Amino acid sequence: AVRPQSPGREASSGGISMRVWIDADACPRAAKDQVVKFALKRQFEVVLVAGQSQIKPSFACVKLIVVPSGPDAADDYLVEHAVPGELVICSDVPLADRLVKKGVTALDPRGKEFSPANMSERLAVRNLFTDLREQGQMGGGPPPHGEKDKQAFANALDRILTRLMRQA
């Protein structure tokens, strides 16, 4: 695993044209695999940021950064290093809120893009579910990542990458 440092952004003359970051600890493997498949086809860099060591796909376009453990260490790293024009894949709503406020595009592994227009609603729903879980009125976690989610994610990823590459 690579120690924390900012990956270099190369000029678009044959180098990396864009970067997709993944909050790797919570991202389903199917979503990570889909991003890597797109990266191989469209020639962009994928940076997995994790709080614990993981198996990194063995492609040159993929980097793994393991941050020191601690609450929100991976989130803080993503907010510090991702820049507008890049995409972050995350299911963490407070993290997405921080990224969107910075102008970074964020997408959840089920294919729903976070935006300034939907952030307050998504934060409210997240807080409600957290409260219900803490009161024992609801089980923990989202449902399993199914085929419908995989397709919605692939479609949203394609749409967002196309948009970001046009803006680059």
Task: Please describe what each predicted stretch is.
Residues 1-17:
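N-terminal amphipathic/basic-hydrophobic helices that include classical n-h-c signal peptides
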Residues 18-168:
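Nuclease catalytic cores that cleave nucleic-acid phosphodiester bonds
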